[in-house]
Every structure is written in C-alpha cells, then in structure tokens.
Amino acid sequence: MKIVCLGDSLTTGYNLAPGEGWVDLLNRETPHLWVNAGVAGDTSTGLLVRLQSQALPQKPDMVLFMGGDNDIMLTGSADQAKSAVMAMVHQCVAAGVRPVVGIPYPVRTIPAQWQPVCDMDRALEASAEYVRW
C-alpha cells in the first residue's frame, strides 16, 4: 500500500536528524510505502494545492493529511484549516483515494519569531477547537 503523507513541519520531521521523522519510522516498521510530502511552514491551503500537484499524481492508495497549525498561528482561527481539510477529503474521494485526517497535537507555545504576529490565547483556543472538530 502506498500512503502519501501531506503536511507541514511535523510531517517533514523538522528539527530531527535525517531518517528520524515519523514517516521514516513508519517506512521502517511497516510493510507499506510511506511518502513524505511535508513542507515546513506550509498552510492548509498549501496542502490543498499540493494534493493536486504532488500527492494524487503519485497514484496513492491513501493520503494522510496533517496540518492546520500554521494557519491557526497566523490567523487565530481554525476556519481556513477546516475548509481546506474538507476540500481535500472530497477531492480524495472523487479520485478513489482513501483520505485520512491526522489530528495535530494542540499548540502550547510558539516560536519567538512568531510572537509579534500571533495572539497566543486566541491561537490556543482555535487549536483546541480544531482538534475537537
């Protein structure tokens, strides 16, 4: 089975040694082919675009989406992420590909460089809403 993992820095394995991300671990521990299509800093809109340009052309059996935290950090809302996830699910179903939605863990802190543009209280509330959704 071929599974394309579409996501942001959590999928990429940001700040981990090469070969130590969760997609790499799944490739070693399961008989399936897991393709890492993560891009650090990507938003849910970016995932939606890359679904058509990078994931579906690979003819996967399944696409696993995990993202939305970057949208929430930048906008303080989960609305854009929810809309993009729904669109990705519909596009996968239309293409005959099984969609799987991964739930990112709730954000508790933000990088120092984001603090001037991120309302942490609002982002935490939106992140919790997104996880519950």
What are these regions (language model features)?
Residues T43-S44, Q115:
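A short linear-motif detector with a strong N-terminal bias
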Residues M1-T43, R50-K59:
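Serine-esterase "nucleophile elbow" of acetyl-processing enzymes
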Residues D24-E29, V49-W133:
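Alpha-helical cap/lid subdomain in secreted, periplasmic
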